[in-house]
Amino acid sequence: NKPYKEGAYYTGKEHSWDEAFGYWGAAAHSLLLSAEQNYNVAKKKDLASADFNGDGVVDLKSEYVFAHAYYASSFDKGGKTTYLEDITRAFLDGRKLITSANGEKLSDMSRARLMAYVDDISSNWEKVIAESVFKYAGSTYKSLVALEDVSNADLAKEFDKYMKYWGELKGFSMALQVGKNNIGETGAKLNRMVGFGPMLLDCLLYTSDAAD
C-alpha cells in the first residue's frame, strides 16, 4: 500500500500488478482489436493496427503484442476461445480496482473482487499454456515423421524445425508445472513423454553440454 519506492507515484501493489501484465504481453489497446488483429500485430503483419496513437511508430512498451498474449490470440482467432479478451480485461479491471483505493489498504470486499480477477487470469492463462503444449506436441510429432522420409537436401531444414518445435514443447510443458496448481503425476508423465532432451540425427538423446 506504500509507494513502490521513494518518490514513486504508484504503490507496490500497483507495481506488482503492472509487472504481471507486462509478462502477459498484451498491448494497452488490445481490447480494441480483434484476436486476428492482435495476432497479426505480433507477427508484424498489421503494424497499422499496432500504432494506436498514429505517430508512425510502434511503441514496444504499449502498442505491441508479445509473449503469451500472442499465443492466446493465435488460439482465439479461430473463434472458439476468448483467452486474450478475458485475461486482458481482468488485468485492466483489477488495475482500476487497485487504483481506486488511492494507496490505502483494500477493503475485504475489494480484495475479494481482486482475487476473483486473479482467478480469471490464472485459470485462463493456464489454459493458454496447455493449448500451447498440445500445439507443439503435434508439430514435434509431425516433424519427426517428416524426418523419416526427408531427402538429404532438406534434412538440415527439417531438423531445425523439429528442434524449434521440441524446444517450444519443452518450455511450455515446464511452464505448466510451475503455476499455482500442482499438476502432480500429470507433470511427471508429461516430462517422460517429452523427454529431457531432443533426439539427434544419430538417434541419441541430447542431454546437456554442462559436462563438457
Listing of model-derived features with the role each one plays in the protein:
Residues 1-208, 212:
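Mature extracytoplasmic or organellar-lumen-exposed domains after removal of signal/transit peptides
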